[in-house]
Amino acid sequence: RQMCIRDSSGGEEGARNGPAIMVGYKNKISEDLKNTLSAISAKTDQDCIGFYEGYGSGHFIKMVHNGIEYAEMQLIAEIYEILRRSKKTNEEIANFFDNLKEENRSSYLIEITSKILRQKKDGVYVLDEIKPFASNKGTGKLTVETSLNLKVPTPSIYAAYDARVQSNNKNDWDEINME
């Protein structure tokens, strides 16, 4: 008998085109299982799958991945807020993020940010109708706790997690005016 625990990443895109899969295993993993998981994984120039020896290793890799994404999303949110408070429009901010793409300083999160900034419904920017509230599922907190336990400084991840917690502590989001 073999034990295989896996975690995946990709959201909607992963559901459509296959997820990135992180497999943790306790003992040797069979070639059949490797092939099956590889077949359903996302593809770039290779299969988007990693095999990590050690029970729970796949979950650990996913946790660290999510912590890094927390930091990236917080950086994007801070850039957005600075530009917005500087009276830049959604279109101007989207153009700023597009320029990062042209300078090879892009990421998937930056690419979707410029798309989100341009989305309208009934002539109104969708983003302007969303309250600045960010929930979490616990992996950011777990990443912070793990980094503290291992004595590894992760100030960007901690600050990003803290910003999410603080966003939940606002009494009345209707009082906030970004314009």
For the regions a language model picked out, list residue spans one by one.
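Conserved Rossmann-fold dehydrogenase catalytic segment
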Residues: G10-N17, I40-Y70, K88-R105, I110, ...
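Inter-helical turn/loop segments and adjacent helix faces that build the functional surface
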Residues: L83-F96, S147-V152
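Short, small-residue-biased leader/transition segments that mark boundaries at the very start
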Residues: R1-I5
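Hydrophobic alpha-helical segments
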Residues: N66-G67, A77, S114, K141-E145
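A conserved active-site cap/scaffold subdomain adjacent to cofactor or substrate pockets
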Residues: Y125-E179
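Electropositive phosphate-/nucleotide-binding environments in soluble metabolic enzymes
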Residues: N27, G58-I61, Y70-M73, A77, ...
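Rossmann-like NAD(P)H-binding beta-loop-alpha module
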Residues: P19-A42, M63, Q74, I82-K88
